[in-house]
Amino acid sequence: MTARKTWIESLASVSLGIAVSMLLAPSISLAQDQPKSRKERAAEADAEAEAPKADYSKEFRKLAAPVQTAVNEKKWAEVLAALPQLEAIPNPTLDDKKAIATWRLQATQGVGDQEAFAAAIESFLAEGYADPENVGAMHRQLAAHYSAKKDNAKTLEHFQKFVEHTPDVQPDELETLGRLQLQAGMNAEACQTLGKAIDTVKGKGEKPKEMWYQLRDRCYIELKDDASRLANLEALVGEYPDKEYYSRVVAIYQAQTNDDRTVMLNAYRVAVSDPDGGLSTVGAYLNYADTALVAGSPGEAVRALERGMKDGVVPTAGTNQQTLNQAKAAVASDKKTLPGEAASAAKNAKGEVDVKVGLGFYSTGDFAKAAETIQRGIAKGGVARLDDANLLLGAALLELGKADEARAAFEAAKAAAPAGSPLGRIADLWLARAARGGTAPAAG
């Protein structure tokens, strides 16, 4: 975190400025007793001439000298005792009042009276005495004070002002504000604040915290904003692949597309083929298996069920085992017929036929033949869904370890898909997966 000079430290220099203005310099610094060169004296004279002159009243000057001495000697009780007389001066100037307020800040902090210190800070801010560079830090001090008192509203109020007045606010500080806003039910504001933290870190080429995405997910749930929630979850699973996050993404795709078979097959595929991903529920794995079987990809059903069983999500007994055995039998049958289907497809002018055969090879785990056949079909033309075909091609290429070619296929899928469409979004999930590297669990 960026080091910042504390505002309370700067009060010392303010207090010294008061002393100089009252011609009390001899009591301030032993360094001033040292002989100075003509050049140093000239520089000081120029600086003094350029500096704004403090406007202290005659009454203030008369009473302030002993108070300044007590300040210099850190006799804070004496300073506090002297302040009421100074505050009673008739018609005090603005500089009189600011000096008194400054001494009150120093003295209340010096004696350790936290309540009086906080009150002095609030008064100092309210009167506009704080230098602009100190306003944020003073609000942060107040936020810490009210946090200790468990006054959530005041904590949020002052931490918000700290952020607003701090040009170099850090991502962790934005997280704190986001948490306070979320606690206060300010979900829209919390989403925005946490998004700023994420964008700030990404702008530096660094990886945002997983927790920031998780907190945003809570915000969007409260706001019932599924569109924004999906975008946040997609970014989360791209950075931190996990079966729970994939399952949330898949569930939203399912709801938004009314369980569209093409979309769901691709969504399940990217989740389960990711070694760091998977699905978190039995229902999701069974839906993947069913979708794959209907689509003519029994090998994906096998991989789905075996992954779910291996991860302890899908029970190994009962109908699940029966479905697995049936899918394995279908794969064995396909392996016998696919060579003939591939030869026939090669002679067909329609590329769509090649793509369907390519799905069969992908199903059986022959990823090289899958990639070859799909590429041939795309080159022929006449493919009904180029986005779907290129996603399948990219998946096969990624299994072969050809990451660069896979990325090109995913980019082609994204370009072919309508803007913002589910398959275009799934292409982005694949691209994130390809950027991380790694291979899928062993194919069945």
Annotated model-derived regions:
Residues L16, V20-A119, D131-A137, R425-I426, ...:
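N-terminal leader/linker segments that initiate helical-solenoid repeat arrays
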Residues E73, V111, K149, A184, ...:
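Structural motif corresponding to the intra-repeat A-B loop/turn of tetratricopeptide repeats
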Residues Y56-A64, L94-A101, D131-Q141, T166-T176, ...:
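Generic helix N-cap/helix-start motif at coil->alpha-helix transitions
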Residues K350-G444:
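C-terminal soluble interaction/assembly domains
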Residues A70, R104, T108, H139, ...:
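Residue at a conserved register position within TPR or TPR-like alpha-solenoid repeats
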